Amino acid sequence: MAKDHSPPSSEGAGATDKKLEERIGTEGLDLPVYDNEVRTEEQTYAFDDSRKIGITGAGFLILNKMIGTGIFSTPSGIFAATGSVGVSLMLWVIGGLLTFCGLSVFLEFGLAIPRSGGEKNYLERVYRSPKYLATSVFLSQMVLLGFSSGNSLAFGRYVLFASGRDIADGWQARGIAIACITFAVLLHGLLPKWGIRLFNVLGVFKVFILLFIVCSGFAALAGHRRIPDPHNFDNAFRLEVGDGYGGGGAYAYATALLRIIYSYKGWENANYVLGEVKNPRKTLSLAAPIAVGGTTILYVLANVAYFAAIPKAELAKSEVIVAGIFFRNVFGDSAGARALPVFVALSNLGNVLAVSFAHARVNQELAKEGLLPYSKFWASNWPYNAPLASLFLHWIVTVIVLIAPPAGPAYNFIVDLYTYPGAWINGFVVAGLIYIQFKKSENWTSPWHTYLPISILYLLANIFLAIVPFIPPTGGSNQDGYPYYVFPIVGVGVLLLGGVYWALWTKVWPKIGGYRIVADRHVLDNGEEVIRYRKVKVGHSE
């Protein structure tokens, strides 16, 4: 997004504004208006050091989003899509490599632009014309599809499984899911310090859960399990078509990789909240690679553990509760074994806390610049210096996605819908990085450098993930009870909706209203951020 760096007008500003402008640099953002509420006024955003995130907190913020429902739930869909133990494991390794490629791209952008907002800032830096178009597309994807529905639903399924009721994605599981996201939103909005403390604790906890699964898997390989040896590693790379798995073709491999990417999602989480990170350049460059590297190793070993204890047909049909089936097959059906899925549910809760924390900050960043209708409300930090309004927006979308699908299997569909548009956004981000690296007039510099082969590999992977889901799968047009084309069409539709929103926002509404809003963002010497909103008539010189 091209930004006007001329000083804001002093029209309507008093002595306080003049003193403010003497102390700070300003960044004027000419924005259309949506309603008649906004007057010349200011909002201030300030966080003391106790609220800022250090290296440990940033690492756990990444871990909490990465280690969530994915590794405990998606291995079922991965194997069902490929029909091969060896290929499934290779896809998990490939997913880890692609994650490191994406991390490198985001480190280069994030260390050069250490502000909250993630991809919003990177797209704005590259795609400056038409003005605001890239931002509007990202806004549509982040607000409408940046939900915590899959994580919350998995929490509900594991709670029910632990209680002895193995129920599909029906209304009981969805009701518990709504309670889960409601708790997360209220905690972050009303007790923000405790929200950070809890997801730090759960970050440690879920690492131990994964380590416990890995160690239990080695025990299962040694013969310590309650079922006969499933022999899953015999001729591991054979492509099979069995009861509920294999034979899906290129479409199946694309959706399998999408679900693996979903499981690795979270490596970019700290980029969303860099404005609340201590010494962001140092913190991000240390916390992100350590968290991603450790998680990748644990993911591959956890999948080996699952294959050591779960027969192929049972794994393919286990859907969300893969880890629950694993515990039952290794430890039996005792009350103690049934309690183990509760620990996975708590891990899922940590993921919901991390996702809602980060996505609410992105929503708030969009609102701070006047990009949302009624932006002043969504940007508010009332009442406890936390983005309760933006958290509420995240809650609304999450609940809608939870209750919208018909009763029955919904988890895989929600995962695909959440992950797919990100392939387009990430593709544009990495393509933009390649462009500004080689366009000398861009004067691009960053403390981190991503080499061209890494960028090209990441770009090609995202093109594959964006295009192949439109190819009909082998053996039928329905996947998990939904037509195969639903999630890619909905995903692309949401991105196109961002273009429609851009046209309304930049062209239609200013003409109808006759004026626009100018949002001037200021950063004080003490780190406080002040945003002043002013009405400006269309065609009026500032």
Name each region found by the language model:
Residues 1-82, 99, 510-542:
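Membrane-interface "cap" regions at the ends of multi-pass membrane proteins
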Residues 12, 20, 25, 46-49, ...:
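Helix-loop-helix junctions that connect adjacent transmembrane segments
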Residues 39-40, 45, 49-154, 261, ...:
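Transmembrane helix-boundary motif of multi-pass solute transporters/channels
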Residues 100-181, 185-186, 348-362, 410, ...:
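Hydrophobic transmembrane alpha-helices that form the core helical bundles
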Residues 115, 139-153, 264-277, 335-374, ...:
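Membrane-helix boundary/coupling elements in multi-pass transport proteins
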Residues 118-130, 161, 240, 292-353, ...:
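TM-loop-TM module centered on a large, flexible mid-protein loop between adjacent transmembrane helices
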Residues 173-233, 265, 288-292, 415-426, ...:
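Membrane-interface loop-to-helix entry segments
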Residues 376-388, 426-492, 512:
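C-terminal membrane-solvent junction of multi-pass transporters and transport-like membrane proteins
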